[in-house]
């Protein structure tokens, strides 16, 4: 799951309900869309490499994963300072690397449920975005803060569950697959649907208009995570998480 620490920070800063950046959402949305396009390009690059040079994919995957984590924190810090001319190329590289690191999951989804799984996940993510953009902007402070708190606690619970899944799988073969994977994938999907609505509430209460790239990064992470968990859910429902 890509980093989401800035989302939790946004929840804390949005508790008072006052608008900090009334135009930040509209300024951020084109960059969220651009990030998604770049991510798709990174996925296609990863799939092409897996097809042409499977042995070379994993070493590059680990390099990309480490670089992706470092880039996230650097880009977030620069974007929060409003230094958008420097943040933009960093976020461009981050989006491409994110796509590359997701290519293995996409390949697994295609192998398990067919190419239609990618279209289903993308369509569901897009529908969530449209609904969240309409409802999230009109959310009252009481509802917005309550949902923000619930999503924040949910993210904490999800991280703990995923750590248990990873550690348990190291000691007990098959521990993290099957029903456990289905539960995590389903919970993650519901959680990030909620986070999508929260984003439209918290962003103008957290970021100034000059911090639109920081806001775009947070929203981008929400939709990337939603896409990931929908794919994981599709894979689990099609038996891809089972081990004989």
Feature locations, PLM:
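A hydrophobic alpha-helical transmembrane-helix feature that marks the membrane cores
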Residues: 1-244
